[in-house]
Amino acid sequence: ANEQDSLTYAAAEKIYARGRMEEAKTSLNKYLQTFPEGAFSLNAHYYLCLIGNEQKNYDMILLHSGKLLEYPNNPFAEEALILRAEVQFNQQNMAEALASYKMLKEKATNVERRQLAETGILRCAFLLRDDIETIHAATDLLAEAKLSPELRNEALYYRAKAYTKQKADKKAMEDYRELAKDTRNSYGAEAKYQVAQSLYDAKEYAAAEKELLNYIEQSTPHAYWLARSFVLLSDVYHATGKDLDARQYLLSLQQNYQGNDDIESMIESRLSKLKVEN
């Protein structure tokens, strides 16, 4: 049986090596049916994972990666987890993807894979609205020595959002201030606005005005957050008794803003409020 086992497997592997995926799939499945506990069953499940990936057959990936993970310390576990977690994430099974990324983090044998796992954990936690998990995951990722600026921004942004929801406003502000240093990306564009909003909420109107005027001068390709900043600046002027300035900023924004979103209604409600009060 042992010789038969290895011969049957070797034949299937040869077909896979030639790139004949459909044929290899049939042969590998046949091998697993004939030798369910065969000496090469892990290899067969691994190749079937790869074929599933090649053919975008996601059920196949989940099935065979699941079989591989029944043997926790097998040499294919890391790659199986990478494929498995990606499928679960794309199918929006966030809790399952989170579990897979956590396993991957424990098993990761190099920095790239550890970072991939930490990024996955962060995104799943954020989408699951699990603030504590998000904060931990972002902090782990931010501790990585070689982190791309894009991932660093993403981690800071998710952590700031989670801190805000947990009422840790001071910590959220630290992350937003860090992000606000570069308003060219969407995270920084929103962060600069959030910093000013927080100053406004604290009734620090002079500081809020300074932050907003600085933002308007700096500008950003993200028109929505710049428009929100104009609206907030009008709120600052209204709060400090400069209704004429408030009205002017709103009218100028109304004429120049093209976006089809909630900005228009923000302008309208403020203009009618100014009309009633004056």
Q: For each predicted feature, which ranges?
A:
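Acidic, polar-rich low-complexity tracts and alpha-helical solenoid repeat scaffolds
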Residues: 1-278
